Amino acid sequence: DMPGHSAAFVRAFRHDMQSPEGMKILKLLLDEVCETFDVPYLHIGTDEVEFTNPHFVPEMVAYVRSKGKKVISWNPGWHYKPGEIDMTHLWSYRGKAQPGIPAIDSKFHYLNHFDVFGDIVALYNSRIYDQAEGSEDIAGTILALWHDRLIDNEWNLVIENGLYPNMLAIAERAWRGGGTEYFDGLGTILPPEDTEAFKEFADFEKRMLWHKEHTFKGYPFAYVKQTNVKWNITDAFPNGGDMDKVFPPEQELKDTYHYNGNTYGVRQAIGAGIYLRHVWGTFVPGFYADPKEDHTAYAYTWVYSPRDQEVGLWAEFQNYSRSEMDLAPLQGKWDYTGSRLWINDREIMTPVWTATHQVKSNEIPLGNENCVARSPLAVHLNKGWNKVFLKLPIGKFKMAETRLVKWMFTTVFVTPDGEKAVEGLIYSPDKQK
């Protein structure tokens, strides 16, 4: 990456990359890279930096090309005209493909921010660069994994970032083309069951889970069936910044609520993980079209179990990005906003958090904050219908403890080892078999 993201280069060589001395060193490094890697392309970066030397990028592009390589560069980044670069890599919402320059689309493809169940829906449904098929200007797509935070187990890269499920989702979309929208359409929310888009995702999910059981057997594959998991979610009640404030759904489940002169409805959602507001705010839609700070939502469903049984539970209310310095919740709390969970009116307590530090640092690894990074919670399901009730307050969308607040929930019953969804369960907010 050049000339930005280069503080380590400066510490090591005591020269800025854009200086004459820095450019000489870079060319020596490029010599070694080009000799070592027998690949047709080399990505040189150029994003998130102030350019102080207008000759830097053109000279580096020319040098890499002189080594027989084609050059890729970020967009946004250095601005090129056709012929001045071989390919651009679109990394943010502002990235735009340019006629005459092939582009790679990886906007919103950052696995380090993905949750377990919501983001894969958007990834699978989304057209690549909102195009039905590739062209001379749209070369394809890439998934990115920026794991800025220290890891103490390399398999955490695979399981917490959902590498294999998302890899299969993007591979199918890139191979087949198509898709139903871009990320800014329905976003992470599954469409209604009677739509072709839902049926396509359900078919993909079925085939993906076959690959989990066969092709990826023995590998960490953090995904279970979610297209059968149905919820009722209320409109959000204004809490005035009081996360503990009690609202009518805590007294009685109804289709409509009247509170302080206003009417609050209930709508259905499908999925084991639901974003009420996405990590990227309104860029990627969640359940609420216009989510507001200082509100409290409720989600509930009934789960039919064919027998009394002990099962596992995946539950989380802030999926921790792997590139952030966010602090783990305080012991006994699910998050910093006061989320709570009940099964059959019995409150489910949190696991014991293994990360207890209170100083934000990229050099301290995540603990068991994310539900797939720990053993499922052991819970009991009665024979018959079981009530699952969630309280989901939100304060501000920015807070000191977690930089990127995700107003969300993940709740699904799994086998005690976390490998599969519990068979024979029916998730129905209306108790319909």
Q: What is each residue range found by the language model?
A:
Residues 2-87, 92-96:
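Active-site neighborhood of glycoside hydrolase catalytic domains
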Residues 307-333:
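A short beta-strand element within beta-rich, extracytoplasmic domains
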Residues 291-304, 373-375:
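Short beta-strands within extracellular/lumenal beta-sheet-rich domains
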Residues 145, 305, 317-319, 392-394:
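Short beta-strand segments enriched in hydrophobic/aromatic residues
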Residues 326-327, 332-409:
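Beta-strand-rich ligand-recognition modules
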Residues 91-228:
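Flexible, acidic glycine-rich loops studded with aromatic residues
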Residues 177-180, 310, 336-338, 408:
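Exposed beta-strand and adjacent loop surfaces of beta-rich binding modules
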Residues 203-294, 322, 353, 387, ...:
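Accessory carbohydrate-binding/adhesion or oligomerization-edge regions at the termini
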